[in-house]
């Protein structure tokens, strides 16, 4: 497959500094990943300015790369809906008037320490989703070998949207919501009662597959 052929090039590079060229599916840092993500954000921004569908949902551990952060803020100002699910540091303020309008930021701090990264972009009729090893930070983008790979199968893409992105955007138990000053408040405090936990829902669905028997409650 294209991905395995690309992975062969990556391993050859790691073993011998073999030049990586002509990749079919993988996007590799420090070579193309930052540029690829910027291109997707700019495409969403252009769609928003044209009055077309414009959506970004990102799930990661940290977002501190300045140029990517500014591009996301610009997308929000242009009218795109931008949701950032960032467990740790995030330098994009949520909904700051005149700077990051249209941007929402939340952190999920539950029982499990997660490391999944999902990047979703919709620009007009075009949808793109990537899974990745990289956070949007300078070290990952420019100093380490990191990978992102596209989710091209529509059914698998929708499954990730439903089971992960949508669930985490509606988490009513473990979420912390950023305000326009960069401060976080617990979603439980904001709603005055706990709601559903995205992590709990995933464990209830898949916990038995790990051989641990009953799902965590």
Describe each PLM feature range.
Residues 1-17:
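Mobile "lid/hinge" segments at catalytic clefts and subdomain interfaces of large enzymes
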Residues 4, 18-22, 30-217:
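PLD/PLD-like phosphodiesterase catalytic module centered on the HKD motif
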Residues 10, 26-27:
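Solvent-exposed, charged helical/coil patches
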């Amino acid at each position: 497959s294209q991905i395995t052929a690309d992975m062969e090039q990556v391993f050859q590079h790691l073993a011998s500094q073999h030049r990586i060229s002509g990749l079919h599916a993988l996007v590799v840092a420090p070579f193309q990943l930052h540029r690829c993500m910027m291109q997707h954000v700019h495409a969403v921004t252009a769609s928003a300015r044209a009055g077309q569908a414009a959506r970004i949902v990102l799930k990661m551990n940290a977002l501190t790369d300045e140029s990517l952060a500014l591009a996301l803020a610009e997308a929000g100002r242009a009218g795109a809906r931008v949701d950032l699910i960032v467990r740790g540091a995030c330098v994009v303020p949520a909904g700051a008037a005149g700077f990051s309008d249209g941007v929402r930021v939340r952190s999920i701090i539950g029982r499990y320490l997660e490391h999944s990264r999902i990047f979703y972009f919709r620009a007009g009729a075009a949808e793109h989703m990537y899974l990745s090893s990289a956070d949007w930070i300078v070290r990952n983008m420019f100093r380490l070998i990191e990978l992102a790979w596209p989710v091209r199968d529509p059914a698998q893409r929708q499954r990730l949207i439903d089971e992960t992105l949508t669930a985490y955007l509606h988490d009513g138990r473990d979420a912390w919501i950023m305000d326009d000053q960069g401060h976080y408040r617990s979603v439980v405090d904001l709603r005055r009662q706990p709601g559903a936990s995205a992590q709990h829902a995933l464990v209830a669905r898949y916990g038995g597959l790990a051989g641990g028997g009953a799902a965590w409650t």
